[in-house]
UniProtKB/Swiss-Prot annotation:
GO molecular function per UniProt: structural constituent of ribosome
A single GO cellular-component term on record: cytosolic large ribosomal subunit
HAMAP family assigned to the protein according to its UniProt record, in alphabetical order: Ribosomal_uL30_B
Subunit structure: Part of the 50S ribosomal subunit.
Top-rank lineage group of the source organism: Bacteria
NCBIfam families assigned: rpmD_bact (TIGR01308)
Protein name in UniProt: Large ribosomal subunit protein uL30
Organism: Streptococcus uberis (strain ATCC BAA-854 / 0140J)
Gene encoding the protein: rpmD
Protein family (similarity comment): Belongs to the universal ribosomal protein uL30 family.
GO terms of biological process kind: translation
UniProt xrefs under PANTHER family: LARGE RIBOSOMAL SUBUNIT PROTEIN UL30M, MITOCHONDRIAL RIBOSOMAL PROTEIN L30
Amino acid sequence: MAQIKITLTKSPIGRKPEQRKTVKALGLGKLNSSVIKEDNAAMRGMVTAISHLVTVEEVK
């Protein structure tokens, strides 16, 4: 299955609590931290909710 690399590019400070919880649930802490996750509907939904805070790349 394909994987995606999610990088936190903007701070969640001052954002809604749901968005901050989503950032933590993805395993992102500090700015420019990255995680590699499986590309599935659940991950895509989480990324869409915080798309203004992260960048997403496909990993082969």
